[in-house]
From Swiss-Prot:
Annotated Fe2OG dioxygenase domain residues: 78-178
GO molecular function (one): 2-oxoglutarate-dependent dioxygenase activity
UniProt-listed Enzyme Commission number(s): 1.14.11.-
NCBIfam families per record: PRK05467.1-3, PRK05467.1-4
Organism: Pseudomonas putida (strain GB-1)
One GO-annotated biological process of the protein: intracellular iron ion homeostasis
Name of the protein this chain belongs to: PKHD-type hydroxylase PputGB1_0905
PROSITE patterns attached to this UniProt entry: FE2OG_OXY (PS51471)
UniProt cross-references to Gene3D superfamilies, sorted A to Z: q2cbj1_9rhob like domain, Rabenosyn, Rab binding domain
Binding residues annotated for Fe cation, in chain numbering: 96, 98, 159
Binding site for 2-oxoglutarate: 169
Length: 226
């Protein structure tokens, strides 16, 4: 399941973020890649724990936690703190699958990467290439969103970032461990939650709503890991 979450940051905020990123000291992106992924990774990244990455990441997570659509789809349990990357001319990341487990720097906790998220920070007309290409059950999806928009997709997906041929592509990305490990189960719960919300708006007093809501929570109780 791919999900588009629009408008998490406004134009003024994005302009300030990009100005700060232009002055930042970048590191080779290979430092956070696994052995196989490092062979395909050609980009720049703010070091883990960098003050600017922490500031952007904290604002991003705070807004997502207040976004019902994201919470319904992801059912997040734990999050690997967001990282910030930059693709300049020639920068790319070949096809790969993210490592199954991530351990934040300085933390004993590990995060299972059930879900991946990318927040686009650059206007799409400011750079050429740089599409996020995701292979899913419906084929190949190419994603290049407006600045401030986020895409959520299964961490099990084979994906890549096409070469940037002009300009710079800034983005934030992170992984989440869901309360529900299996993507198909999360998708079913998301569809059911959406239907319940729509029925609540259309026929708020319908007696079946109580039963449907109970079924949702019973399924969540069966599948959730806490």
């Amino acid at each position: 399941m791919l999900l588009h979450i629009p408008g998490l940051f406004d134009a003024d905020e994005l302009a300030r973020i990009r100005e700060a990123l232009e002055q930042a000291d970048w590191a080779d992106g290979k430092v956070t890649a696994g052995y196989q992924s490092a062979k395909a990774k050609h980009n720049l990244q703010l070091p883990e724990g960098h003050a600017l990455a922490k500031e952007i990441g904290s604002a991003l997570i705070d807004r997502l936690w207040k976004t019902p659509r994201f919470m319904s789809a992801a059912l997040p349990h734990k999050v690997f703190p967001p990282l910030i990357n930059c693709y300049r001319e020639g920068g790319n990341f070949g096809f790969h699958i993210d490592n199954a487990l991530r351990q934040p720097k300085g933390s004993p906790e590990r995060v299972r990467t059930d879900l991946s998220s990318t927040l686009f920070l650059s206007d799409p007309d400011s750079y050429d290439g740089g599409e996020l290409v995701i292979q899913d059950t419906y084929g190949v999806q190419q994603v290049k969103l407006a600045a401030g928009d986020l895409v959520l997709y299964p961490g099990t997906s084979l994906h890549k970032v096409n070469p940037v041929t002009r300009g710079q592509r800034y983005a934030a990305f992170f992984w989440a461990q869901s309360l529900v490990r299996e993507d198909s189960q999360r998708a079913l719960l998301f569809e059911m939650d959406n239907a319940i919300q729509q029925l609540t708006a259309d026929v708020p007093d319908h007696p079946s709503l109580l039963q449907l809501t109970g079924t949702y929570h019973n399924l969540l109780r069966r599948w959730a890991e806490v």
